[in-house]
Amino acid sequence: DYSSIQYRRLNTRKGPAVQATRIQADRNLYKSYIRGIIGNSKNLTILQRTIDSILVKNNKIYGVKTNFGEEIYSKTIIMTPGTFPNGLIHMGDKKNSAGRIGEPPTVEISNSFKELGLDVGRLKTGTPPRLDKNSINWKETEIQLPDSDPSFFSYQTKTIANIQLPCHITYTNERTHQIIKENLKDSPLFSGEIKGIGPRYCPSIEDKIVKFADKNRHQIFLEPEGLNTNEIYPNGISTSLPINVQLKIVNSIKGLENAAVIRPGYAVEYDYCNPQDLKLSLESKIIENLFLAGQINGTTGYEEAAAQGLIAGINAARKCENKEEFILNRKESYIGILIDDLITLGVDEPYRMFTSRAEHRLLLRDDNADMRLTQLGYDLGLVNDSDYNSFLDKKMDYEKFIEYYATKKISPNKENKKIFKDLGLNELKKQYSLKELLRRENINFDTLNLISKDIEILKNKNLINLLENEIKYEGYISRQLDDATKIEKFKNIKIPKNLDISFISGLSNELKQKILRVRPTTLGQASRISGITPAALNILMIYIKKNEIEKNLI
């Protein structure tokens, strides 16, 4: 909230399970705020060093060695090296060792991991060229305004902190695509220079042109980097083509005909460690007391990295205090889904989180995030008293209004019938509770406030969203909770390696093919295959048990 320069609610035309608030953050404001928090934290010493190796004895880490030869000892260590392990930057036929442009990689740490038996692989990500905002013809682009009444991320935020800036949209065109096709020979992605696999869901522009040859344009979001910078981030044209080609690509796009490239785009290859070698706490199974988080675990994206850093930090601290691991499960958080996917399924490309990865995403809406997780955070010592008291107040109001809406009745008297008719609603033929009325598709809280003057009016927007979604989708939410409970019972049942599922009646051929392709080792893993239902899991469980009985009879 402190660094936001644009709030925007996403997927507002879709259901609440896939809606979310996105902010465009001012990089400098965000950085200075975080530095302030870190700098003012008690018992925290900040050192700027390069780590050359980790110190291990009897498969247990006890410290790190810096590039200055210093040895720093600790009971637990968290490593979040990003794209720096063996980082290699590509721009056309030019390549140089770096974790980020202008910053050297960490080579020794990768070698250290390999020597200690960690399974090290190679991935790739990329970044677009940065543009000068003063060289863009904004009139030729589509404006995307910020929300005028946004939802904040923190209880403490009462007002918008900064001037809100618009983003803009433009598109590639056939000329752009032609330039890219003519220069694919100079792309390290297609010449074989880049060995690492890139992210499927945010590919480079050259990758898009090849993979989606039928598309005659691709969307580009022109995003401001901050309030006091001229840099624009053209989200959608990540590239590793030579700089002269990048300029041609940019200048072929509507509104960017005269745009100046401040910094070129590039691809970066880096080492990562197989996340299947981690526990759910993000502690290594191979090296005790070593915790890994972020791109080193095969993920891509800021939120994905932050989520892992949080869990690794919690568990590293708890291990120092000999406390049990803190694990979030799949039905209570996206963090739980992210980590469970990484550890049970592994990665063969950079992993990004989507709502579609959640089996029970109606339980994981952003309007109920505080209801799901604040108590856990407070118990861990991560939520301050002020925020916790705000949460308790909201929870108390929620329980009060759920009860109120279930018991407050609207009668079919003459006045109410007229109101319903004037609002274009179906005729009120009998007495209904407010809760029953709110379940109707065309009735929301604003409608209820018009229907009856003596209804207790709610003013807390976040609580209104929570109540409305919990009431409107109560049946679906209840069903997903039941499904999650059933899957919990199944999850540890092992699937025999040689189980022949081709004869299972009740499973579609499509599901059989998916199971054969993924080859899950437990029903818990099978439950995460797209399209698998609790009913299908039940059929699979019955078949496994039948198979075991038949084996015992032989």
PLM region spans:
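Internal hydrophobic alpha-helix adjacent to the cofactor/substrate pocket in enzyme cavities
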Residues: 305-326
